[in-house]
Amino acid sequence: MNSPSTDQPFGDIERIFGYADAIDDSMPMQVVAPEMALMSCFTRQFCAALIRTAEACGGFDQHPDDPVPGHELSLAQISPRLFDSLQNDLGSRIWPQLQEQWQHIDYHGLNDAFIIKYQQGAQEELRLHHDVAQVSGSIKLNDDYTGAELEFPRQGFSNAPVPVGSLLVWPSLVTHPHRSAPITSGTKYSLTLWFELPLQLN
């Protein structure tokens, strides 16, 4: 279940605008497949608040210029303050862990962070592709659905066993093409992170 417990002192407003009750550091980074790492990131309560807030905002749209269109909603559209809080958190808490795996990466912030919604009759799957970023990440926001696994054919890995709130990361370009399998029941929500490419030097 994704609903916060009744004794939890934080509501959605505190979570979304104050980043309250967001951080989960219970699981250290572990390598789960070739050049892929997994670590805890968000609490279930924060994930559920993201879903409720995204649905309240609406606007899950496919962008016409996107070569791999999905029903997406950027966190920057929901709240620039939320986007900034996430960007700062990832830079200070998550990126140093990633540098243990990939020593020569530098943090240049987020290119985007967006929620993708999958359901039958709408966005049911996502074709095989790779991203245009330095590092990509995916956070499963709920698990009350079937199908829609994030699959990496070259690495022989899927996110089926990944817990809600955990962050799966991989190098974005060339080596890690991935897809979302068809959803078979329920509604899936996931948060995609694109870490910005290194800045061009003049």
Please report, for each region that a protein language model flagged, where it lies by residue.
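Proline-rich intrinsically disordered, low-complexity coils
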Residues: 4, 9, 28, 34, ...
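Short charge-dense sequence patches
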Residues: 1-7, 34-49, 86-89, 115-120, ...
